[in-house]
């Protein structure tokens, strides 16, 4: 071992086990450009596109939800403004699947309803 001060373990080196010098590029963190900030967020993965809120079929065709959609809160996505909004949540209770759908009136801006 090669050391100037026996109490200083920071500068102690063992032949063959020298710490390599860090490359300068590892400390060169470039800030993100403005084009990164203007991009749209990534699309939802395909397996999260299928929720019971988007199912237009009858209740006889109801399916068991995939594991990845359980315990997620979904909101109805409509282009046209509606007077109510639907929220949905599916979870597993033992061997059954329970889906709760809540309809809430939408308060329009500027309305006098309290």
UniProtKB/Swiss-Prot annotation:
Regarding tissue, the record states: Expressed in rosette (at the protein level). Expressed in the whole plant and at the different developmental stage with a higher level in stems.
**Segments of this protein annotated with the region Disordered:** 26-50
Gene Ontology MF terms in the entry: maltose binding; protein kinase regulator activity
Q: Where does the secretion signal sit in this chain?
A: none
- UniProt cross-references to Pfam families, sorted A to Z: AMPKBI
Q: Which domain of life is it from?
A: Eukaryota
Identify the keywords attached in UniProt to this record, alphabetized.
Carbohydrate metabolism
Region Association with SNF1 complex (ASC), as annotated, extends over 40-114
Q: Tell me, what does this protein do in biology?
A: Regulatory subunit of the probable trimeric SNF1-related protein kinase (SnRK) complex, which may play a role in a signal transduction cascade regulating gene expression and carbohydrate metabolism in higher plants.
Would you identify the family this protein belongs to, as annotated? Belongs to the 5'-AMP-activated protein kinase beta subunit family.
Query: How does the record describe its quaternary structure?
Result: Subunit of a probable heterotrimeric complex consisting of an alpha catalytic (KIN10 or KIN11) subunit, and a beta (KINB) and a gamma (KING or SNF4) non-catalytic regulatory subunits. Interacts with KIN10, KIN11 and SNF4. Interacts with FLZ1, FLZ2, FLZ3, FLZ4, FLZ5, FLZ7, FLZ8, FLZ10, FLZ13, FLZ14, FLZ15 and FLZ16.
Q: What is known of its domains?
A: Kinase-interacting sequence (KIS) is specific for the alpha catalytic subunit interaction and Association with SNF1 Complex (ASC) is specific for the gamma non-catalytic regulatory subunit interaction.
The name of this protein is SNF1-related protein kinase regulatory subunit beta-3
Q: Lineage of this protein's species?
A: Eukaryota, Viridiplantae, Streptophyta, Embryophyta, Tracheophyta
């Amino acid at each position: 071992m090669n050391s100037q001060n026996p109490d200083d373990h920071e500068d102690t080196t063992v032949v063959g086990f020298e710490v390599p010098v860090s490359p300068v590029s590892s400390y060169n963190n470039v800030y993100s450009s403005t084009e990164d900030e203007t991009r749209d967020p990534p699309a939802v993965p395909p397996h999260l596109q299928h929720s019971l809120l988007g199912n237009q079929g009858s209740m006889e065709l109801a399916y068991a939800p995939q594991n990845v959609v359980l315990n997620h809160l979904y909101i109805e996505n409509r282009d046209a403004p509606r007077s109510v909004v639907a929220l949905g949540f599916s979870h597993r209770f033992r061997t059954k699947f329970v889906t709760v759908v809540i309809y809430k009136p939408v308060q329009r801006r500027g309305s006098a309803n309290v």
